[in-house]
């Protein structure tokens, strides 16, 4: 029979466990330490990425804090023209790669972006999200983090990379454009799980109404190897998605099913902010 003291202790411990899990700030996943890199590992987290991937210590890294008071407004910067973003992706795979949920189209449609004569072809879409509604995005805008940041990754003929970033904020209303993704997340709970999308995905439905309004700077990949020379276009418009849709993402795990995965929720998968150094953030308003 438990004594009053032991009962009080158990209740206190339960409250503490609930507090830390609810806040999402503490992720205790031993399997993370077995990976080449992770977001929450004790020895291979973001602060240590540069030990293995030297470019992660570079001077032009991403993500950054975008401060609108310090951007340079350039009326001559070209519009971001998108082609075939309105054409449904009828065939695509989605994979839990242990770091994100990533979607790769498998149809023959070339979806492209063009800015100032440079054309980049869409390759994949992935996401960074948080354990709470006020964190998750990699970039910040005037100090604010959003619940999720979508990255539309493109390459050109020279294999240069351009990424379009879109902020999503938590809402009571679900995003219809996100539903083809959410409906299959339960099929990829663990790392290396993959499946095909069951419904058509329209990229345009994941974009704000005026994608030509954006912030642009030169940066890097936000994951190892942190390769620099990436052209970033962070769209100004903020999209909405349902809290329940975010909850489905938070139910993914960062490790495989054969590991001790209980503490390995795939969440808060965003890299800390990197110094801007001498770079300039260009702001457009078209």
Segments from the language model and where they lie:
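Alpha-carbonic anhydrase
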Residues: 2-286
């Amino acid at each position: 029979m438990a004594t009053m003291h032991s009962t009080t202790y158990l209740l206190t411990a339960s409250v503490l466990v609930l507090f830390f899990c609810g806040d999402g700030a503490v992720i205790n996943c031993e399997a993370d330490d077995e990976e080449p890199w992770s977001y929450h590992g004790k020895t291979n987290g973001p602060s240590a990425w540069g030990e293995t991937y030297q470019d992660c210590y570079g001077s032009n890294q991403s993500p950054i804090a975008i401060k609108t008071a310090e951007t340079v407004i350039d009326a001559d910067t070209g519009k971001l023209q998108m082609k075939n973003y309105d054409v449904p992706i009828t065939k695509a795979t989605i994979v839990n790669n242990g770091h994100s949920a990533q979607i790769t189209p498998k149809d023959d449609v070339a979806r492209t972006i063009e800015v100032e004569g440079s054309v980049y072809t869409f390759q994949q879409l992935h996401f960074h999200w948080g354990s709470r509604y006020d964190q998750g995005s990699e970039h910040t805008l005037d100090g604010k983090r959003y619940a999720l940041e979508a990255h539309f990754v493109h390459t050109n003929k020279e294999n240069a990379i351009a990424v379009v970033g879109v902020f999503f904020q938590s809402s009571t209303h679900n995003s219809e454009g996100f539903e083809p993704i959410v409906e299959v997340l339960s099929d990829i709970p663990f790392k290396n799980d993959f499946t095909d999308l069951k419904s058509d995905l329209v990229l345009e439905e994941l974009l704000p109404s005026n994608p030509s309004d954006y912030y642009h700077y030169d940066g890097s990949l936000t994951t190892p190897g942190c390769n620099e020379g990436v052209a970033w276009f962070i769209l100004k418009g903020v999209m909405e998605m349902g809290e329940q849709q975010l909850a489905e993402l938070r139910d993914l795990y960062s490790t495989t099913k054969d590991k001790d995965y209980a503490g390995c929720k795939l969440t808060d998968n965003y890299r800390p902010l990197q110094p801007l150094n001498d770079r300039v953030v260009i702001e457009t308003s078209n």
